């Protein structure tokens, strides 16, 4: 996860140059010693910048945290941007390719999940969860077959 977090940090440094005081970023990284598929965070952070905080006249803040729980690793990307109505977005007929690609990579490569919650006028929270034990619905047989035993 440290490589993905570093890519996000570099991306946000560039965006902060572009948007100045309108884009604030805070980090709370307790752990980064776990597997995270490539390009599983940057699309979420890009959405927070492009569709969240920079849509507010006064800008806003993006908070990125990573922590370990007993059963999983969690990376949370939260913003205080404009938010959105999930029902309207789901029904607008557009495909949300970036988010679906992230969700697919997480599921396929590590049994992870992506949950997104948003409220208009409040902001958005995207949470990635990576189980410590891997995908319990199919990954065990793959692992057993490829462990050499």
Q: Across the structure, where does each feature detected by a protein language model lie?
A:
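C-terminal end segment of the histidine kinase catalytic
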Residues: 119-149
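Two-component histidine phosphotransfer core
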Residues: 1-117, 125-127
């Amino acid at each position: 996860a440290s490589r993905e977090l570093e890519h996000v940090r570099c991306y946000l440094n560039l965006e902060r140059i572009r948007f100045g005081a309108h884009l604030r970023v805070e980090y709370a990284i307790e752990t980064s010693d776990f597997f995270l598929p490539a390009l599983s965070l940057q699309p979420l952070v890009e959405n927070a910048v492009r569709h969240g905080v920079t849509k507010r006249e006064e800008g806003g803040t993006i908070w990125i945290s990573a922590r370990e729980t007993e059963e999983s690793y969690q990376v949370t990307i939260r913003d205080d941007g404009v938010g959105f109505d999930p029902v309207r977005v789901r029904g607008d007929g557009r495909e949300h390719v970036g988010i679906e690609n992230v969700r697919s990579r997480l599921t396929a490569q590590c049994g992870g999940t992506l949950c997104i919650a948003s409220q208009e006028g409040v902001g958005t929270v995207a949470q990635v969860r990576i189980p410590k034990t891997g995908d319990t619905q199919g990954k065990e047989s793959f692992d057993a077959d490829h462990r050499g035993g």
